[in-house]
Amino acid sequence: MNNPALPALYAQHLSVLKQRADEALARSGFDHLVVPSGTQHWQVFDDRDYPYAVNPQFKHWLPLTRLPYSWLVYTPGRRPQVIYYQPHDYWHVVPDAPNGWWVEHFDIHIIRKPEDALALLPNPAAHCAILGEPQSALGAAPDGIYIPNNPQAAIDYLEYQRSYKTPYEIALMREAQRLAVRGHRAAEAAFRDGASEFAIHMAYCGAVGQDANDLPYGNIIALNEHAAVLHYTDMGRSPPALAHSFLIDAGASCHGYASDITRTYAADPAGEFQALVDAVDAAQRKMGSAVRAGVDYKQLHVDAHLQLMAILKDFGMITVSPEAALATGVSAAFFPHGLGHPIGLQVHDVAGFAASDRGGRIERPAGHPYLRMTRVLEPGMVVTIEPGLYFIDMLLEEVKKNGHAGSVDWKRVEAFRPCGGIRIEDDVLCTHGKPENLTRPAFAQAA
């Protein structure tokens, strides 16, 4: 990534994190913030490890995603420290020597064995707020055991504040968009060439330069009726005899930050399914333009149901009004997931339900159990906007069982079933004014 502004943006970002850490420690009554990067995990009855996943609290401070057995230590008023695990190992590639825009801001201690960190961690352990997984525990009595205690007051505050992205974070998320769009373009080309789902996936990974261990989530590459499976990840090795549609939900990572993008393509650009895709795309753009400060995300979700049902009404697939389809649950059969979620260090980022930085929960509206965001939007938040329309046999059968078969024109629905469904997703930044769509400009630049 070649962004000359990044060092200055990172310095500002680090200043914000220090201020947040000061408050989190004050609220939780601890003297030191200690964040392990995480450990390798091993498969049961085997000597093979699972892919390493860094602690999100660690990569919030440091652009390091492949550094197990390391630690961040922050004490208010002092220079932060990084305990950097770089073993002597001829079996595996070891982490590079510390380098990059972050190095000048930390005291760095190289260790060769995980237990070497004990001599460098603040003492006593009881004075430390340790944020991590249980497997990161280090030490033994009587000298002290550094067991992640995850004090709730600190977690509540830090996760809530993560909703407000710094300019540094936005810069990395923009780059994650650019990388993902490169893959989306390659995937669409492979689809147009008649490739299988697996071959499309490989084209995507090759264009992005990331594999399953790097991508922020497993790619969804769905041809035809497979698009009716919301998280379809099977990836058929052979192409279908006749391609009708292609749904791709795939992102990319940039120094620990994620993008999450979905597009749907029709094999026949002059067909009725293409017209339906175009209608959902237009509605999705409108939904994205509503990501404004002070708007309740729950209301955006309900409004999305009404807009999508209006499309189905226009296409003759439902016989009732959008309002009636929503009230009777018919809309949930066609749009069974939430409008979106927060995104950042994690694809489904934290604090989507948080009532405040002191805890509490804002519940989902009744009848919408899969919504992942219930907060009022504020500047600095980044959310996905991902409406969808699907033809899922199981859910459509429930419409019939619930006595609402007359609300649906089944012949019209049957005509679209071979296409599976449609989902279109962008990542959108809430600002003090107009929202900034982070995804669409990346597609325009890659055209």
Describe each model-derived feature in a short phrase:
Residues M1-A447:
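Active-site neighborhoods and metal-handling regions in enzymes and metal-associated proteins
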